[in-house]
Amino acid sequence: MFRILRIHGESMAPEYQSGDFVFLMKVFRKGLKQGDVIAFENRLYGTLIKRIEKNTDEGIYVVGTGENSLDSRRLGPVNRDKVQGKVIWHIRRR
């Protein structure tokens, strides 16, 4: 299953910028590894896109590349059930 999302915000800049599009592919939990960029659902902030820092028994730790990224340093680990997919393709806005 595939999904297209539009990036809002600068938490993953400069790699992903506001207005860019990403294509997600649903993956099995074991298919996620360090360095992958994933989209996941957060109950307070909606869908977020971040890079996997580490995948542990307690959850997935994610980081953003932007200066003030809202990531696991503030939110804690991501529950694997909240992962919507892995970014497989990126289209930059012009």
Regions found by a protein language model. Give the residues of each.
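Extended hydrophobic leader/signal-anchor segments used for secretion and membrane insertion
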Residues: M1-R94
